[in-house]
Amino acid sequence: MYAIVENGGKQYKVEVGHLLHTEKMNGVAQGDKVVLDKVVLVKTDDGKVLVGKPYLTNVTITGIVVEHARARKILVGQFIPRKGHKTIKGHRQWYTTIKIENIEIK
């Protein structure tokens, strides 16, 4: 069974036991339970597909926050020709890792 869930403006495919790397979720600590309720699609083990318009109200996905961490550094550069000017900046995006515990259809 798998589901497609929306979180942080993006859609992710999740299965029970998998780790989900999503945008940083403020207000939750490591070890807290999280309920993802914006479920777009669910495919059950017997092949049945449930599609929401836009979301499924009878499906909830629960998980546990594993960690808050930062991604690899991305370098952004600017070069102005004939002036000898160069600028390089770095950015590391925060993300939250969630372990999916259960996909429940009510």
UniProtKB/Swiss-Prot annotation:
UniProt entry keywords in alphabetical sequence: Ribonucleoprotein, Ribosomal protein, RNA-binding, rRNA-binding
GO terms under biological process: translation
Tagged with keyword Oxidoreductase: no
Record GO cellular component, one term: ribosome
Domain of life: Bacteria
Family in the record: Belongs to the bacterial ribosomal protein bL21 family.
Function field: This protein binds to 23S rRNA in the presence of protein L20.
Cross-referenced NCBIfam families: L21 (TIGR00061)
Name of the protein in its database record: Large ribosomal subunit protein bL21
Organism of provenance: Fervidobacterium nodosum (strain ATCC 35602 / DSM 5306 / Rt17-B1)
Gene: rplU
